[in-house]
Amino acid sequence: MRAALAAAAALPVPDAEGDHGPARPHPLAPGALVLIGLSGGADSLALAAAAAFEAPRAGFRSGAIVVDHGLQPGSAEVAAGAACQARALGLGPVLVERVRVEAAGGPEGAARAARHTAFDSAARATAAARILLAHTLDDQAETVLLGLARGSGPSSLQGMLPDTGRLLRPFLGLRRATTRAFCADSGLEPWDDPHNDDPAYTRVRVRSAVLPVLEQELGPGVAEALARTAEQLREDDQALDSLALEGAQELVSQADDGSVALEVRGLAAGPPALRQRIIRLVVSAEFGVSLSRSHTLAVAALIADWHGQGPLSLPGVRVVRQNGLLTFHPHT
């Protein structure tokens, strides 16, 4: 159960041999391969050039994965051109993968899902240790604003992670103008994706209209401030997740019938934010269910607003308070 809770919290399992802190991720082994997610645009082309220069000096190899989404005429030629640029820079291996973008989930989300599936496939095929993506500080600021508009809590304002363990984003501290200037100074010819100027896409409207207005009305530095906010929220979120994991491991017990229980007294002693995280963590780890905020608050009411309520039936799980325990049963 300990490992399942840690996995659900997206945290490393504590190191039983050390100082009880999280185990440190292993560095890249000598000769390890990293793949650049290359579109041919200025950001990814600059990253490809940087990797081609730095990788041999750091003792690892660099290749590229070019994903052809097939969403516009000439996409195969664009992908082939990006692959040629990667090879000219000295990257290898260079893979080109054509993907099918499903209609479900919106065009941006569907394209991203297809792209990441291709990344996974390329990593398996080449035994690559990491995939490097060229998202910039501008991309991060846009992501934070989009999360703010969704209003789905602090997690939606954390932006993109610099390091997920599989994906690395080394350019999150750089502005987009820097990568374009680098390409110009280096004689590299990036491809400009027409979709990046299409206002049909929400992110394009944020980029071309919302951020410029904020900079104009509030002064320069808005993008940097949004990126700093995301970083601070990630730090806070990791701390709260660690506390939630520790609390869950202290309060949880498991029965032979598949149910899981939490001690009510221990949950009630903590602040609401931590209590709700523990509830979400346990339900996610044990039942694979992601509780919405309204469902989480309904469960928390069995602790903080207890007046003899009956069982609570939620998607995938049934919750009962009895004998000082909050017990979660899987729906059968």
Swiss-Prot record:
Compartmental location: Cytoplasm
Keyword annotations of the record: ATP-binding, Cytoplasm, Ligase, Nucleotide-binding, tRNA processing
GO molecular function ontology, one term from the record: ATP binding
Catalytic activity reported: cytidine(34) in tRNA(Ile2) + L-lysine + ATP = lysidine(34) in tRNA(Ile2) + AMP + diphosphate + H(+)
Entry GO CC: cytoplasm
InterPro entries: Rossmann-like_a/b/a_fold (IPR014729), TilS/TtcA_N (IPR011063), tRNA_Ile_lys_synt (IPR012094), tRNA_Ile_lys_synt_N (IPR012795), tRNA_Ile_lys_synt_subst-bd (IPR015262)
Pfam families assigned to the protein according to its UniProt record, in alphabetical order: ATP_bind_3, TilS
EC identifiers of the protein: 6.3.4.19
An example Gene Ontology biological process: tRNA modification
CDD domains: TilS_N
Signal peptide start-end: none
Coiled-coil parts of chain: none
Binding site for ATP: 39-44
Superkingdom in the source lineage: Bacteria
Main location: cytoplasm
Biological function: Ligates lysine onto the cytidine present at position 34 of the AUA codon-specific tRNA(Ile) that contains the anticodon CAU, in an ATP-dependent manner. Cytidine is converted to lysidine, thus changing the amino acid specificity of the tRNA from methionine to isoleucine.
Entry note about domains: The N-terminal region contains the highly conserved SGGXDS motif, predicted to be a P-loop motif involved in ATP binding.
Family the entry assigns: Belongs to the tRNA(Ile)-lysidine synthase family.
Name used for this protein in its record: tRNA(Ile)-lysidine synthase
Annotated organism of origin: Leifsonia xyli subsp. xyli (strain CTCB07)
Upper lineage: Bacteria, Bacillati, Actinomycetota, Actinomycetes, Micrococcales
